[in-house]
């Protein structure tokens, strides 16, 4: 599957600006991690892009629709990573891709939320300030902090370095992401 084909799937199911920005930000972070780990960065980017593609149109079935669609077109590895990121299914984390999606999804969204409450947005945002916000349970309360912790542990990265990596990717793409 090409990125353009993946974007067509995303845009057929997702219309809201917030979810589209989340998809784009996770796409970019996953692409960067794919390069960092010497993996197929296009596949990693597509996984990040599509991980919540069916959430807006089919919230009660998420991620069943997108997983089934991906399996039908032979994208089993991406489908498995998306299945695993939905922790309620209890799917095992078999590959680095599976672990990276879990590690990047919630924390990328959380980092964007941190930007939205700062006058200077992403500029000057530090891992220390993101970690401080993580401790405030009332801030971005829907973010699953235990999933962030589990993802970081599974991926085998340091939380501070992981946050710094995400900030760097978001900062490099701030115009595209409007942050």
What are the roles of these predicted feature ranges?
Residues 1, 5, 21-25, 61, ...:
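Conserved active-site and cofactor/substrate-binding residues in soluble primary-metabolism enzymes
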Residues 1-57:
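Acidic/His-rich, divalent-metal-binding segments that scaffold phosphate/diphosphate chemistry
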Residues 7, 11, 24-27, 31, ...:
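Predominant activation on well-ordered alpha-helical scaffold segments within soluble catalytic domains
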Residues 11, 31, 35, 71, ...:
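Short polybasic/polar patches that bind polyanions
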Residues 14, 127-129, 134-179:
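C-terminal binding/interaction regions
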Residues 16, 97-100, 160:
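Amphipathic, non-membrane alpha-helical segments in soluble helical-bundle scaffolds
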Residues 37-140, 149:
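Divalent metal-dependent catalytic cores for phosphoryl transfer on phosphate-bearing substrates
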